[in-house]
Amino acid sequence: MKLDFDPGFDITPLSVDEGFRLGADCFDKGTEFRKLDSVRKSLRDPNCDGPENVYAIMMDVGHKKDLPAMQQRMLLYGVVTYAAGQLGDEPIRSQGHIHKVSAHCGWSTPEVYEIWTGKAVIYMQESGQDDPGRCFAVEAGAGDVVIVPPGWVHATISADPKQPLTFGAWCDRDYGFAYADVRRHGGIAWFPLLTAKGKLRWTPNPAYHTSQLTIKPPRDYSDLGLEKGKSIYRQFEEDPDRFLFCLLYTSDA
């Protein structure tokens, strides 16, 4: 699968059934394959049809030479590739979760996304409680970076059913995903739906209180020292401390 943006190390997504191919100078901790049956509880139609493997995910990957620096800073790089197609009338997407409270930070840490190929929407809502708070749908393409603030519910959505979505992300090495709040509401506060022409539209989830959804492009993160157009992995290699804000960041996306 050809990438539209250079991720900064030798990795090729193969498919949601095969995972990834890595260069000889890279390490990984294996690939997980997320099945449709494992995400049904968070879909608008839990009985929908869709690909058996919704996405393939590899947590903890990169150049072998960089692993000690990543471990020392409690940072982890993960990669995900989605199936093409859709889940009933919804696009291919993740379930939606909150990051668990990190043992070494004592709080739910943020995540730095970078899109490699495909069209993405990073959906986020301020809370997993009945009042979801502020809700955003950040539209992103190849090379775009989106940061999810700490403690926010978030889901990654493929906005183009005709092609797979692939992306990488920096997060806390002591990561973990909390799904209970989202599943208790039968999904996120706004469901993405696909029109007959393959375009996204949004409908509120009645299990939550009324909220407003703001659709927006990615913001500029130069205030956090990030360089637009350069892969976030390469930026880490140039300055391994650059992403320590992942463990300290408190601003909005």
Regions found by a protein language model. Give the residues of each.
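A short, N-terminal "cap"/entry segment at the start of jelly-roll beta-barrel domains
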Residues: 1-102
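Short, charged/polar surface micro-motifs in flexible loops or helix N-caps
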Residues: 85-88, 119, 173-175
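Conserved small/polar residues in nucleotide/adenosyl-binding loops
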Residues: 249-253
